[in-house]
Amino acid sequence: VTPSTLWQSGYEYALDAAQRTVLFWDALRQRGNNFVEHERQGLPPVLRFDYEIVMDGRSFKRPVNYALLRIVPPKGVTVDAKRRPYVIIDPRGGHGPGIGGFKDDSQVGVALREGHPVYFVIFFPNPEPGQTLLDVCEAEREFVHRVRELHPDAPKPGIVGNCQAGWAAMMLAAANPDDTGPVVIVGAPMSYWGGAWRE
């Protein structure tokens, strides 16, 4: 190692560190701008697909901050109302609701391409006053019941629960076996013996 190569290496290291620092802070700036813009828009779901609100839990007798959406199939995709509908329950986390359908190759996209009607349970940012977990379970039961009404000639809906929504899907299926079809829980480790009712 000569003094000139040492200086050259030091210069390259300093230049690289400075460039990476600028890129790091620029990434944070872009992330912050995206967050502010999303909040300015009213925190809509990050779904890639168009949708229609079927039921809004904020209008229920026991209001909850959840809603049932019907995913509108994109151009070129045809769904069969007699095929098993899918109800995808989104997890409460991340940048907002919609992670299960934020790109074409997602749970929503795959089910649509196979010709299944797809429904999506989203959440609004703030819970309703006095809302309980049991209220949410009841709302989800009403959502699934409504999907069954919309597809009377189809098999029972498949329920997909992502992360903590996997637990909601399991509670829903356990309490309402006559309304639910197969249940898929994604990233939701289950402990069948842990916890207590009031904890």
Where are these regions (language model features)?
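N-terminal cap/leader regions of alpha/beta-hydrolase-fold enzymes
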Residues: V1-E199
